[in-house]
């Protein structure tokens, strides 16, 4: 058996087309163009690529895109002042601070300063609480992308499905668990202190790998017919070159799984598409609230 390769690029492109159409309707009805502000502190090359792609795709769907590139030596007070200004800017409905931040900046304080109603990444404690309570909120973009893929594969309910999340980060693992529970899956979270992760994998109908360890999950860990979502993005050396691989050993896993996301081209494109989806949702909510 060879798995269906889930094409995240195609699904993300379809989502962007829907967002572009909805955005045009929203602008026509309200006269308001959704505004997404992205703050980048420092000059990390990978972050620069991510930020540039976010800006390009935001403009393609009709958003106002504003990118603020701040020097690496920006102080905590200066960064917080910029966030407060954007909180109060009526043109902006979504604010994102690109992570990781330079070591001298406190990411927790920075993220908590973003207005929860403009928190496009869903990292503010209020939105985290809303997510676990099952209330409307901004959902972190990568877990949301995974959830949309699973809905396309299984439908709205995951009742009776055993889901294993490998990784317990605030960005992916924990919010992913909340989303899976909302879809009625039976959820297990594995992490660095979990014994015998392969045994847990072999019981899972759905495996979501998000630990940042190249090809950690082997093909013989995967239950026959499972759906595997690989969130990892790792650069490894191959001879005198480098290549991107996920947290799953793709070649062996695809011979066992029913469906699997590749790296690159799987979850990555979905993350940016969901950022745009969240931005439009926030724009609509702000408009309805009259703020």
From Swiss-Prot:
PROSITE patterns: THF_DHG_CYH_1, THF_DHG_CYH_2
Pfam families referenced in this protein's UniProt entry, alphabetically: THF_DHG_CYH, THF_DHG_CYH_C
Pathway annotation: One-carbon metabolism; tetrahydrofolate interconversion
GO BP, sorted A to Z: L-histidine biosynthetic process; methionine biosynthetic process; purine nucleotide biosynthetic process; tetrahydrofolate interconversion
EC number: 1.5.1.5, 3.5.4.9
Highest taxon in the source lineage: Bacteria
Reaction(s) catalysed by this chain's protein: (6R)-5,10-methylene-5,6,7,8-tetrahydrofolate + NADP(+) = (6R)-5,10-methenyltetrahydrofolate + NADPH; (6R)-5,10-methenyltetrahydrofolate + H2O = (6R)-10-formyltetrahydrofolate + H(+)
Subunit structure: Homodimer.
Function: Catalyzes the oxidation of 5,10-methylenetetrahydrofolate to 5,10-methenyltetrahydrofolate and then the hydrolysis of 5,10-methenyltetrahydrofolate to 10-formyltetrahydrofolate.
Similarity comment text for this entry: Belongs to the tetrahydrofolate dehydrogenase/cyclohydrolase family.
NCBIfam families, sorted: PRK10792.1 (NF008058), PRK14186.1 (NF010783), PRK14188.1 (NF010785)
Protein name per UniProt: Bifunctional protein FolD
Native source species: Dichelobacter nodosus (strain VCS1703A)
């Amino acid at each position: 058996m060879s798995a269906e390769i889930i094409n995240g690029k195609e699904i993300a492109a379809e989502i962007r087309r829907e967002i572009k159409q909805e955005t045009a309707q929203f602008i026509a009805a309200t006269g308001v163009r959704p505004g997404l502000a992205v703050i980048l502190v420092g000059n990390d090359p990978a972050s620069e690529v991510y930020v540039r792609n976010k800006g390009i795709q935001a403009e393609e769907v009709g958003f106002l895109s504003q990118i603020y590139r701040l020097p690496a030596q920006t102080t905590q007070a200066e960064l917080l002042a910029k966030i407060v200004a954007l909180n109060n800017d009526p043109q902006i409905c979504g604010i994102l601070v690109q992570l990781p931040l330079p070591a001298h900046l406190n990411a927790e304080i920075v993220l908590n300063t973003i207005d929860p109603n403009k928190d496009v990444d869903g990292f503010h404690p209020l939105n985290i609480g809303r997510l676990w309570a099952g209330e409307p909120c901004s959902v972190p973009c990568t877990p949301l992308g995974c959830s949309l893929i699973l809905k396309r594969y299984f439908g709205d309910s995951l009742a009776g499905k055993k889901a294993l999340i490998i990784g317990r980060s605030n960005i992916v693992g924990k919010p992913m668990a909340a989303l899976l529970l909302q879809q009625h899956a039976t959820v297990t979270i594995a992490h660095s202190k979990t014994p015998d992760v392969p045994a847990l994998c072999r019981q899972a109908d759905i495996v979501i790998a998000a630990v940042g360890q190249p090809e950690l999950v082997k093909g013989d860990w995967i239950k026959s017919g499972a759906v595997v979502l690989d969130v990892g993005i790792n650069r490894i050396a191959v001879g005198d070159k480098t290549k991107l691989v996920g947290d799953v050993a793709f070649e062996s896993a695809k011979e066992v799984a029913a469906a699997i996301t590749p790296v690159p081209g799987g979850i990555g494109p979905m993350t940016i598409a969901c950022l745009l989806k969240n931005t439009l949702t926030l724009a609509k909510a702000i408009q309805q609230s009259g703020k």
